[in-house]
Each structure stands twice: as structure tokens, then as C-alpha cells.
């Protein structure tokens, strides 16, 4: 388990076919352990992004948050 004050563990972004995946796991000084992931795809005529995050353990533990968005250019 991650102890209070432990370093965050951002994983290197991974790219595959224009998709970029960025996972992250960290713990803050209040004892909250948060995991999150961001996904992006930037193309010639579009941008897409989505993310999911959750405080897994700690005083701010709650339901996950998420977002999805994008743009299309003609």
C-alpha cells in the first residue's frame, strides 16, 4: 500500500495508432489514494479525449468521476 507522503507513480504515456493512454496512481498528504487514466486521440480532422478517476482509499473516497469529449473539424 502507498504510505502518506509516498511518491506518485505516473506511468509513461503509451501511444498506439494515434491513441495516447496516460495512467496515474498517487497518494496525497491527506492519505487519499487516487487512480486515474486519460485517453486521447488527435487526428487531422478530430480530437477525442476521455478520462476516469477515483479516490480508491482515504477520507475523500467517493464514486468515480469521468468525462468524454471531442471535436470534429471539416
UniProtKB/Swiss-Prot annotation:
User: Looking at the record, which segments are called Disordered?
Assistant: 1-74
Q: Which UniProt keywords apply?
A: Antibiotic, Antimicrobial, Immunity, Innate immunity, Secreted
User: Domain of life, per the record?
Assistant: Eukaryota
The question of whether Repeat is a record keyword is answered with no
Question: Where is the protein situated, by its record's location annotation?
Answer: Secreted
Q: Which GO terms describe its cellular component?
A: extracellular region
What are the BP-aspect GO terms?
defense response to bacterium; innate immune response
Role noted for this protein: Responsible for the anti Gram-negative activity of immune hemolymph of Z.atratus.
Q: Which family does it belong to?
A: Belongs to the coleoptericin family.
Q: What is this protein called?
A: Coleoptericin
Organism (species): Zophobas atratus
Amino acid at each position: 500500500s502507498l504510505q502518506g507522503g509516498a511518491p506518485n507513480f505516473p506511468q509513461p504515456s503509451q501511444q498506439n495508432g494515434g491513441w495516447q493512454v496516460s495512467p496515474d496512481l498517487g497518494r496525497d498528504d491527506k492519505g487519499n489514494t487516487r487512480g486515474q487514466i486519460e485517453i486521447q486521440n488527435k487526428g487531422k480532422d478530430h480530437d477525442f479525449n476521455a478520462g476516469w478517476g477515483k479516490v480508491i482509499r482515504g477520507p475523500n473516497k467517493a464514486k468515480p468521476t469521468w468525462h468524454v469529449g471531442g471535436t470534429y473539424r471539416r
